[in-house]
Amino acid sequence: MLKNKFIYGLIGKEIDYSFSRKYFNQKFKNEGLINNSYENFDCKNLSQAIKVLKQKNLKGLNVTIPYKEKIIPYLDTISKEAKDIMAVNTISFNNQGKLIGHNTDCHGFQKSLFENINKKTKNALILGTGGASKAIRYVLKENSIKYQTVSRKKNKGDFIYTELDRDIMSNFELIINTTPLGTYPNTEKCPDINFDHITKDHILFDLIYNPIKTSFLNNGKIKGAKIANGYNMLIYQAEKSWSIWNEIN
């Protein structure tokens, strides 16, 4: 039996699709970290998720929907970014056994975003107002990029989809999809925008990474827009989680 086995894992619901388990277990193999393993903790409800926090040999956890916000009251403290965003996607354990919540989505998005835009980008349109949009709004605000949001319901966003005419769309260089529309296996789905209003002056960013090119991105590319998916964001947030778990600056 291996000594000092360290367990990492992902807390979420219906997470068979998980990128994280495959990514980290391959990382452990590549780096010869034979005492490390990364597991999926598929929790049907919050009480199951809380039980995971008490397991032995846990070195670090990631958290995904629907527990990014619900898990917060059960942690001992959270980082400034997590507090501002009010969502946690990474949990570390200090030497005293305290549970500390972090948000590495903001790090991943910021690093990936600035690979795809220039410093002149000043206006963004965010499709979706759910939990996934929280870290996005935080990053845009921190970088002085003005944004407005689109929702299916008027009272939740600045616009509803039917209001997005050519004049409105021309005001935003950057359009970010934070909805799950287009995620595998429902790849034919797409946010309800008129792609005739998309031009070569637009940048379309989709948080989805599977498939690599969603209907949203494909329709944008046809109109000449620059496109980017969420894969690099995922890599960057995962590596940030790893550095937090191992206290790497």
Predicted regions and their residues:
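NAD(P)-binding Rossmann-fold cofactor-contacting core
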Residues: E142-F159
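Active-site capping/gating segments
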Residues: K111-S112, K226-I248
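Short helix-loop-beta connector
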Residues: I117-N123, I198-K200
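N-terminal Rossmann-fold NAD(P) dinucleotide-binding loop
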Residues: S133-K134, K213
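Glycine-rich Rossmann-fold phosphate-binding loop(s) that bind the pyrophosphate
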Residues: K13, G128-G130
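Rossmann-like adenosine-cofactor binding region
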Residues: G157-A228
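Phosphate/diphosphate ligand-binding glycine-rich loop within oxidoreductases
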Residues: L2-N116, N219
